[in-house]
């Protein structure tokens, strides 16, 4: 079944989990097409993470952000369809631990992640130069690791999520020569 055939897929499902390998603008259009077809979308992709009325949810931390779905439905003209996203995989390891510490006024966080090649969607067969190698900078990952927690810790105002301004997060994301797993 072709994931881009929204009409055909829509006949067979009640909702979709979206984890496709496409350009961001194509993913955004595809997810909106599903939502507009009244099919709820839970996305693993980053395309809609910064859409103001799309909740980026870690349920035990910010389930109140789900209330923006009503504003999103108005924008999309839907009754049932919506898009919700999960955050970057690396921040799911440290945001739950940091969240209770926010009440103590932490001002700065320094985070370092060690990410397997699977996080880049690759294997050693496809990326032999990674064998016995470490890449000390992963383009785009540091920005996600520094900014996405602020959306998760943000507040809902007028149907949009306004990101928090603190703590300031500095991240270093390193690609390591292991097949699966992030630390």
What does each model-identified segment do?
Residues 118-183:
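Charged docking surfaces used in two-component/phosphorelay signaling
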Residues 1-130, 134-137, 161:
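N-terminal Rossmann-like NAD(P) cofactor-binding subdomain of oxidoreductases
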């Amino acid at each position: 079944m072709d994931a881009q055939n929204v009409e055909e897929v829509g006949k067979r499902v009640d909702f979709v989990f979206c984890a496709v390998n496409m350009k961001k603008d194509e993913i955004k259009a595809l997810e909106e097409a599903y939502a507009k077809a009244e099919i709820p979308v839970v996305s693993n992709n980053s395309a809609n993470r910064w859409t103001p009325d799309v909740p980026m949810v870690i349920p035990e931390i910010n389930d109140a952000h789900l209330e923006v779905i009503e504003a999103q439905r108005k924008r999309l003209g839907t009754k049932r369809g919506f898009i919700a996203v999960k955050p970057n995989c690396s921040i799911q390891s440290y945001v739950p631990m940091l969240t209770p510490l926010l009440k103590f006024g932490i001002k700065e966080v320094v985070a370092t992640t060690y990410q397997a090649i699977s996080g880049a969607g690759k294997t050693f067969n496809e990326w032999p130069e990674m064998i016995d190698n470490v890449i000390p900078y992963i383009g785009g990952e540091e920005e996600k690791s520094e900014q996405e927690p602020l959306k998760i810790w943000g507040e809902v105002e007028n149907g949009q999520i306004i990101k928090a301004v603190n703590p300031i997060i500095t991240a270093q994301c390193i690609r390591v020569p292991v097949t699966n797993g992030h630390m």
